Regions:
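Conserved phosphotransfer microenvironments
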Residues: 24, 44-84, 92
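Short beta-alpha junction loops
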Residues: 20, 87-96, 116-118
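Alpha4 helix (beta4-alpha4-beta5 surface) of REC/receiver domains from two-component response regulators
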Residues: 70, 94-110
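C-terminal output helix
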Residues: 116-125, 137
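Short hydrophobic/Thr-rich beta-strand motif most characteristic of the beta2 strand and flanking loop
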Residues: 35-44
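Conserved acidic segment of CheY-like receiver
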Residues: 2-31, 57
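CheY-like receiver
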Residues: 130-192
Length: 193
């Protein structure tokens, strides 16, 4: 991939969620090719000092599925909105449909399969910024609204409304202000009425 200069993504910081060595170099190469600015390893997050307004968490495919789920939970449970509502992107190789859907159900903001053209990957990252994105929050899930992708037998029960409520959060991620909740809607189940 050829490195892109991108005035928007260049102001964002990529947080590499991977092991050191080849996986980290792969994420660094991806970040440079798509025009992302600074790259820091996930373990360095606490030592960054003042966080930039927009972070991208880039999770390497080499992490186990259990590890991916744990990372998503840690990020989505973080008290800082810049972390909790940062785009979490899975960087992967080509996937079969079943595996791809399992990652969608986990709650990734996007899944980028390599190799692909740097411009296309950059555009997909830009799609996470400067627009309202609908998130769903239940007692077991916080992430993008993926209900339109539900298929019979889907496995991510945490995304389903509980007997109590679910919340729709409209998130806007701007370079100047970072992620913000621009609209919140609570929905209670009819059985509780």
């Amino acid at each position: 991939m050829t490195a892109l200069a991108n005035p928007v993504l260049g102001n964002c910081t990529a947080i590499a969620c991977c092991t050191a060595g080849a996986a980290l170099r792969s994420i660094e190469h991806f970040a440079a090719a798509t025009g992302l600015g600074r790259v820091a390893h996930y373990e360095e997050l606490a030592s960054l000092g003042t966080l930039p307004n927009v972070l991208f968490f880039l999770i390497h495919f080499g992490i186990s599925d259990q590890g991916k789920q744990a990372l998503l939970h840690q990020i989505r449970a973080h008290p800082d909105l810049r972390i909790r509502f940062a785009p979490v992107i899975l960087i992967s190789r080509d996937l079969d449909t079943e595996k791809f859907l399992s990652y969608v159900e986990m709650g990734f903001d996007d899944i980028l399969c390599l190799p692909d053209a740097a411009k296309l990957l950059s555009d997909r990252l830009l799609n996470q910024l400067n627009r309202d994105i609908l998130y769903i929050e239940t007692s077991k899930y916080l992430g993008p609204d993926r209900r339109r992708l539900d298929m019979p037998g889907h496995t991510q029960s945490g995304r389903v409304s509980t007997s109590r409520m679910h919340v729709r959060l409209y998130i806007h991620r701007g370079l100047a202000e970072g992620p913000a909740i621009v609209k919140r809607q609570e929905f209670w189940s009819r059985s509780d009425a």
